[in-house]
């Protein structure tokens, strides 16, 4: 049985925006959605906040399943959920 992970994107009102199989694609779309105001985009997780980058996102998700990370700027925010696809 293979492990297939998917990443779901939700806005801050929990409206579904999309499903992805690639971290690169979901990071691109999350930053594009949040990058509207004057402040930079940050990743918020249980470990704290840090500037949004693909490397940081990959390291936060490494070894975890059913885990949520938030992208935030001064005016917008989205949630990224990593979960396992069940067969």
Model-derived features with residue positions:
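Short aromatic-glycine-(Arg/Gly/Cys) micro-motifs in beta-strand/loop hairpins
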Residues: 1-16, 25, 31-33
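Short, mixed-charge low-complexity intrinsically disordered segments
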Residues: 35-87
């Amino acid at each position: 049985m293979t492990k297939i992970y998917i990443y779901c994107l939700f806005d801050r009102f929990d409206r579904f925006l999309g499903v992805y199989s690639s971290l690169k694609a979901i990071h691109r779309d999350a930053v594009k959605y949040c990058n509207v105001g004057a402040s930079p985009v940050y990743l918020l997780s249980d470990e704290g906040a840090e500037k949004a980058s693909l490397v940081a996102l990959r390291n936060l998700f490494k070894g975890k399943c059913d885990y949520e990370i938030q992208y935030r700027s001064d005016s917008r925010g989205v949630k990224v959920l990593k979960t396992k696809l069940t067969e």
